[in-house]
C-alpha cells in the first residue's frame, strides 16, 4: 500500500476518533457511519480500521503513557490533539513496522491539518518526551 494511503488512513482515523471521543458511541458504529459518509477510495481501509479499533481498545493505556508529559490535565487536552497523540502512541507502542520518525512526523502533520494554530508544536513537544519511553529511536 502506498504511503499516501496510510497518511489518508491516519487523517480519517483522527476524524473518526474525534467523533468517537465526543459522542462516546460504540467505536464500531462510529466506523460504519464514517465509512458510509466519507470518500475513502484513496484510504488504506485496513490500516484505518486497525488504528480506530486499536486506539479505542488501548485508550486508557495510551492516555497513561502521555499524561506525565502533558503541561496540563488530560481532561483539558483538546480532542484533536488527544486523537493525534493517541494514534502516534498506538503506532509507537503496537506497530514496530512504523518507523519512529514516521510516527512522530505524521502526528505533527495531522496536528497541522486538524489542530489549532500551534497544536503541532504541542504534539511535537509531548511526543519528543514520551516517544523514547515507548520505543527506542531508530
Curated annotation (Swiss-Prot):
Name recorded for this polypeptide: Transcription antitermination protein NusB
GO CC term, one of those recorded: cytosol
InterPro entries: NusB-like_sf, NusB_fam, NusB_RsmB_TIM44
Lineage: Bacteria, Pseudomonadati, Pseudomonadota, Gammaproteobacteria, Enterobacterales
Keywords from the named record: RNA-binding, Transcription, Transcription antitermination, Transcription regulation
Entry function: Involved in transcription antitermination. Required for transcription of ribosomal RNA (rRNA) genes. Binds specifically to the boxA antiterminator sequence of the ribosomal RNA (rrn) operons.
Gene: nusB
Family: Belongs to the NusB family.
Biological process according to GO: DNA-templated transcription termination; transcription antitermination
GO molecular function, one term: RNA binding
Cross-referenced Gene3D superfamilies: NusB-like
Pfam families recorded: NusB (PF01029)
Amino acid at each position: 500500500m502506498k504511503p499516501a494511503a496510510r497518511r489518508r488512513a491516519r487523517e480519517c482515523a483522527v476524524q473518526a476518533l474525534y467523533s468517537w471521543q465526543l459522542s462516546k458511541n460504540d467505536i464500531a458504529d462510529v466506523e460504519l457511519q464514517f465509512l458510509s459518509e466519507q470518500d475513502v477510495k484513496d484510504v488504506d481501509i485496513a490500516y484505518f480500521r486497525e488504528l480506530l479499533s486499536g486506539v479505542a481498545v488501548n485508550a486508557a493505556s495510551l492516555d497513561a503513557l502521555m499524561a506525565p508529559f502533558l503541561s496540563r490535565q488530560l481532561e483539558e487536552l483538546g480532542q484533536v490533539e488527544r486523537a493525534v497523540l493517541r494514534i502516534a502512541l498506538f503506532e509507537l507502542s503496537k506497530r514496530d513496522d512504523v518507523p519512529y520518525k514516521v510516527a512522530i512526523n505524521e502526528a505533527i502533520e495531522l496536528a497541522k491539518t486538524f489542530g489549532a494554530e500551534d497544536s503541532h508544536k504541542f504534539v511535537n513537544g509531548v511526543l519528543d518526551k514520551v516517544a523514547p519511553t515507548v520505543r527506542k529511536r531508530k
